């Protein structure tokens, strides 16, 4: 929360004071969770209050849980003991990241051209980053501009060489447990946010749930970066650091 960058934060009402104390800047609080607001270039924080049942994909929770509990799913899925294979809310939150990015566009899409998702717990991977610096750096902003309207993700190249080097991945990969794309941080130009939301939403509903399958958003992105290479820009991690992309943009 102390990172010097404009933020849109989606929280339950009990966390508003916690955020206020740690952001310490101009804050807009949207009490009804609706889309709209009055973001200006001078504002640094917008807090969107949402109850649990207002999480974008909450309406899929019972359907997902029914799939996860089925014997067919446990038989077909690699490593079905993973938390995302047992608790529906995990996938509800993971896939809601993309809808939250869309909602962020509605608040300040006229003021900002680039949007990134950052997990609430991602600060444990900042590795001593100097929080007094503006984020991202001017050099990083130039790199983002040079990227055009693509969506930036970190691809971890060190471990699953067959996945990294594959030209395409079959739908069988949606049952895999080998994630090679970072899910803690991703984003890009506002035009790409809409494109990626739509293809992720389609994958979740029509390639996963319709076939009685649910897997995490890293698996989804790993499949999609191969299927739609023109939509994505890839930062190839080679040093084993979990969130090296964060440092690269700093």
Give the positions of each predicted feature.
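Short, acidic, metal-binding catalytic loop of nucleotide-sugar glycosyltransferases
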Residues: 1-6, 22-27
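Short beta-strand/turn micro-motifs composed of small residues
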Residues: 9-11
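Active-site-proximal specificity loops/subdomain of glycosyltransferases
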Residues: 25-109
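Catalytic core and acceptor-binding pocket of nucleotide-sugar-dependent glycosyltransferases
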Residues: 122-128, 149-151, 158, 167-250
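Short, charged/polar "capping" segments at the starts of alpha-helices
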Residues: 13-20, 161-163
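Short coil/turn segments at secondary-structure boundaries
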Residues: 21-23, 62, 129-131, 198-200
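GT-A fold catalytic core of metal-dependent nucleotide-sugar glycosyltransferases
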Residues: 89, 93-152
